Amino acid sequence: MGESPGLHPYCHGASEATATLDMIRAVREAQALGEIPGMEPDNGELFLTGYSQGGHAAMATHKYIEENNLLEEFNVIASAPCSGPYEITGAMADTILAASYSNPGYIVYIMASYQRVYGDLYTSYSDVLKAPYDEIVEPYFNGNNYTLGMGSLNEQLPQEIQSFVEDSVLENFLAASDDLSHPIWQAMAANDNHDWLPTRPIKMFYCTGDEQVSFQNALVAESTMLENGATDVEAVFKGEGMHNDCVLPSLTDAFTWFESLKTACSLSIEYLEIGDVEVFPNPIQNTFRIETEDFLNSNVSILDQSGRVVYEHQDLTPNCEIDISNLTSGCYFLMLNNVNKSITIKLIKA
């Protein structure tokens, strides 16, 4: 599941955190070497967000930074985890153990991930999964899967955990619900990230109709952190939508919150001179124009909030008009690039 080689360590906090920090270090190094033309100077402020597993990753990264005394290197101004499984042993366990769970593939995914990391959950899928499901799941998690997706796996698994997990495994797992002595419980507990004391602001966005990741994760994390002594932690209600409905309102509000907290970069005169671009109207109904002299003949790209390119245009002409009527409402980023410089401008599609 994914283009990188090997099995992705799903919801393994340490992997999520170290991969994120290594990525930031790599970008800073590339910037220092001048390998990212037109990139704004790094002012040292870090904002963390992510959705679903990305919410778990954002929380894990923030937690890792604070608990390993890395705030001097990674100055977290705020984090905004969205719809993430922060309390895996509680709110998430209650969800997947319910009478019916709409995304049973996640259950196998997390077992496969923790088996890869800890190595003590099983020796083969037949140890933990009933036939024929032990053979069905193998191609999804063999580390060489580039085409099979979670939707396909969910369609092939029953929505009742007792229908595909071996009876003895489930019985032993449930029997250890109080002391968490079962290896699967221990792996889950090692990746809970709701019970710690953040010193930097956190907002956790959630929707109450989320059928994949219980909104109780955010509420439990909020209450636990406040009990631990945190002073700036909040679970933020974003409506009654389901998991996919909650993406845009959550990430849009996270971005808006970050915008209110950031410090404007102290840009050089040279940088200000290359930023002579006018976009109007903005917010945009259907079309907008770009007026510029500095970026004529540039390549034009529009990215959504996940970084996906949703529009491309080459060779920018004077007073160019761009039609984005096919895009849904929300926040986007206009990027203009030529051989010498680049600029990014926030767009709001009404």
Provide a role label for each language-model segment.
Residues G44, L197-I202:
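Short, proline-enriched alpha-helix->beta-strand connector loops that line the catalytic pocket
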